[in-house]
Structure formats: C-alpha cells, structure tokens
C-alpha cells in the first residue's frame, strides 16, 4: 500500500523543532498546532504546513480578571446534605471543595441569589431563617427542624479555570499562576475580549486557523479538597451563570429565577434527568446569547482571512451543534476529542461546517506517557473503537495533542500512529461518494431531543 500525505494535525513546542519536522514527514501531517502549556516555535512558521493557534476566550488574561473581579465567571454549587440535630444548624460552604478553585460570591445579594432548602420537605427556607458568617464561611440555619436534611445552593467565582487546573495537576506544573475564568458575556469584558482577539490576530499573522477553546462557559467540572474530580457533567450548565445573566433571563421569561432550576436536588439536570420547563427555558436563552456572541468573534476571524475552528469541549456550553442556533455562527470547522464511536459521531454528524477533525487519544500527557505506561495499547483501543464510526459518518481530519517530546520516548507508539494516519487516509479516500448500508431498527426518544444526540 503506497503512502499518502495530509489530513493529520500534530502538536509542537519550542523544544521539539527538528522532531516536529520529522513527524510531519513520518506521519504525513499537513498541520501543526500549539496546546495548553506549549508555545509555537518561530522556526516552524514557514514549513508549508497549516498552522493552528489555540485561542482561549475566557482565560489567560489574569490582569484583566483581577482588575474586574465582578466579571469573573461564576458557578452554582450545592453543599452536601446536612442533618439538623438541634434547632441550630451550621453548614460550611467550602467543605470538600478545592479552596484555590472557588471563592464564595458575597458581592451580590446572597438572599436573592442563594437558596437554603429543607430537603426533607423539599421547601425553600425563608431568608429570615438563615444567615451567612463570612468570617468562618458558614451558613447558620435557625430555627432548624430536628432530623431534617438541609442544603445550601450558592454562587462562587471560578478563581482557577477547571481545565487549566486539570492540566496543571496532571502535568505537575510548578510555580504556575492559576488562570482565572472571566465572563465574556458581561459588558466590560465583552468589549475587552473583542479588542483582545483583534490584538491576537494582529500579532499572529502566520496563523491559518484560530482554534477556539471555546465559547464561553465551562461544562460542570468541580474538584475536591485533594484536587480530585468531585463532579463532572460534560453537558452541565451550572458554570454558565451570574446575576447579570440571570436578570436578563428573568426579563425574557417573565418569572423569577431560582437556584434550584440549576441545582435540581443536586442532580444538576444531568442527562439521565427529566428537565424542568424552567431549565429548558434557560437553555434556550443561553444558546441564543452564546451563539450571538460567538458569531461576533467568528466574524472578526473571517475579517482577518483566517478559518475559525471550535474545539467541542471545555467552555462549550450553549454551543450544542445540533441545535438551530449553531448554524448561525458561521464556524468553518469543529474538532472534538474521540473517546469512542459515539463521541466521534457527536461531532462527525455536525452540519453547517466545512470539515470536522477528531483529536484522538491518548493525549500526550504524563498520565499515560510515563515509565511503565502503555500508550500504544490505549491508542489501539481508541482507534479500533472509533474506526467503524468513521465509516458510517466520516470526519475529514484526525490529530493529536499534548507534549510531542513525551510521545517520542515511545518508538512503538510513534510507529503505530504512523500506521493509524495512513489507514485513516485510505479509509477517507475509499468512502468518498458512498453511503453506508444501514438497517434502522431502534429509535430512542428522550426529553432532551436532538440537543443531546450521541450524548
């Protein structure tokens, strides 16, 4: 089988310039990208390969975030259930939460935006019956009903972006300042973000593709006090909130917002729940507003003659690609992480873009690429799991991310990825103009509809 070239994106960094050139040839890659924690080398600007630049709309600008603390991104958190054994109950808000990630928001009216609920009866506790002691971080409920369970739902600022925190923990980055997540939806930050994007484009004239990561709200990702993942919901909306946003929502729907619309008894409206009317109203509002703002950024990128690509993950809430609002944004491409065939179909089925790209696993991080690790096995499982989905709904490109120098320490892995790249190109060429045979046997109906297709 003769070798072909193209349709592959590889990562690079300042310390792997010759190796990047070698991998461009060996894997037949035609595009190079930077990643979180890496820099694009000036020496690779004129290789002839397409250049992707990762762009973070909501972080990597701590100076701005610190100067505008009121416009830091927020999320709703619910405490664990606490049982009252007397007429007074104290609940510490930050129990089992990573202290550097979140800061309790007392700037906005807590009696308006927080909620204490008697989970035994399901009723909200009157704001006259609870108070917050900012010194010790406790909510005090008085009078509490003995042996009833209580929770507190509160707003917290995201002082360490969850994705940046994950990357820092996994890679054991030392002396790295936590990146604060700012809220692009708010007025001052919105104007600043458009200027910031233009400055980025002015200084990155060599870039062909702006790889947005992403627009503009992080999926629900919370860490415990030991920096372990405490709660993850890739579809979660709990970090897409602020009083500024919620007041706009209230004006549109004509009823008062409650934190419980998001908290949902602690289930956070996950995929296995039946969503309330209020939560679905909130999603409609968020999708429209996020799409409107994303289109502004995409239009700026097009103005500079570059392609706009969205990474389908991280801060992607409100950008659900199977909904009508997505088509209005005008993106050129979507790239998604390939966990299996279902997650590949999540973006390979997307319409209204010129091409889709699968970022295959393993990511070149030390949690896999370490002494005793077996990245080749993980790569084989990932490729074989996703390959059939490519035949049924083709993607146009594949790629990898992370630290290339780690991958190069595993020659068997490097050789296997060479085979994967070649096999993908053969599959891509052979399936053009064909329609896979499919016997339709099962239809799945759920409350979420097409919004969570393949979810």
Predicted regions and their residues:
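Long, contiguous N-terminal structural blocks used for assembly/anchoring
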Residues: 10-14, 47-49, 79, 91
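The substrate-binding groove and active-site-proximal loops of carbohydrate-active enzymes
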Residues: 6-14, 29-35, 98-100, 104, ...
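Polysaccharide-binding and catalytic clefts of secreted carbohydrate-active enzymes
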Residues: 69-328, 346
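Boundary/entry segment of secreted carbohydrate-active catalytic domains
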Residues: 1-30, 159-160, 166-174, 310
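Proline- and acidic/polar-enriched loop/turn elements at helix boundaries
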Residues: 36, 50-56, 313, 338, ...
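Hydrophobic targeting/anchoring helices
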Residues: 27, 44, 63-68, 197-198, ...
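Long, solvent-exposed N-terminal ectodomains/accessory regions
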Residues: 14-39, 49, 54, 71
């Amino acid at each position: 089988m003769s070798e072909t070239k193209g349709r592959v994106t590889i990562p690079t960094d300042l310390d792997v310039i010759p190796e990047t050139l070698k991998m461009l040839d060996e894997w037949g890659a035609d595009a190079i990208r930077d990643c979180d924690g890496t820099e694009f080398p000036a020496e690779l600007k004129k290789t002839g390969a397409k250049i992707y630049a990762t762009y973070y709309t909501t972080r990597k600008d701590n100076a701005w975030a610190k100067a505008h603390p009121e416009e830091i991104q927020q999320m709703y958190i619910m405490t664990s259930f606490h049982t009252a054994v007397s007429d007074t109950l104290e609940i510490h808000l930050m129990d089992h939460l990573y202290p550097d990630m979140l800061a309790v928001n007392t700037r906005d009216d807590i009696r308006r935006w927080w909620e204490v609920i008697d989970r035994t009866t399901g009723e909200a506790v009157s704001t006259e019956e609870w108070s917050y002691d900012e010194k010790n971080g406790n909510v005090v409920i008085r009078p509490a009903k003995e042996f009833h369970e209580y929770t507190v739902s509160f707003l917290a600022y995201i002082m360490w972006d969850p994705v940046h925190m994950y990357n820092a923990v996994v890679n054991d980055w030392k002396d790295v300042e936590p990146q604060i997540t700012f809220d692009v939806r708010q007025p001052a930050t919105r104007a600043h973000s458009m200027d910031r994007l233009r400055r980025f484009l002015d200084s990155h004239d060599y870039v062909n593709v702006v790889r947005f990561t992403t627009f503009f709200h992080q999926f629900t990702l919370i860490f415990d006090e030991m920096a372990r993942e405490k709660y993850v919901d890739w579809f979660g909306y709990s970090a897409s909130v602020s009083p500024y946003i919620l007041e706009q929502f209230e004006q549109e729907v004509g009823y008062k917002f409650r934190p419980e619309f998001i908290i949902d008894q602690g289930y956070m409206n996950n995929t296995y729940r039946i969503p309330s009317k209020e939560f679905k109203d909130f999603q409609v509002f968020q999708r429209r507003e996020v799409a409107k703002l994303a289109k502004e950024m995409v239009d700026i990128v097009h103005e500079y003659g570059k392609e706009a690509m969205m990474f389908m993950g991280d801060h992607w809430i409100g950008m659900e690609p199977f909904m009508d609002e997505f088509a209005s944004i005008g993106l050129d491409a979507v790239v998604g992480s390939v966990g299996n065939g279902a997650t590949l179909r999540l973006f390979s089925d997307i319409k209204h873009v010129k091409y889709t790209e699968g970022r295959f696993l393993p990511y070149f991080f030390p949690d896999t690429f370490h002494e005793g690790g077996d990245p080749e096995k993980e790569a084989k499982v990932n490729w074989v799991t996703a390959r059939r989905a490519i035949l049924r709904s083709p993607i146009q490109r594949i790629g990898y991310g992370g630290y290339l120098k780690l991958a190069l320490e595993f020659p068997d892995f490097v050789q296997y990825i060479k085979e994967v790249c070649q096999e993908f190109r053969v599959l891509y060429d052979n399936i053009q103009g064909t329609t896979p045979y499919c016997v339709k046997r099962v239809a799945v109906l759920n409350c979420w509809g097409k919004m969570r297709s393949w979810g």
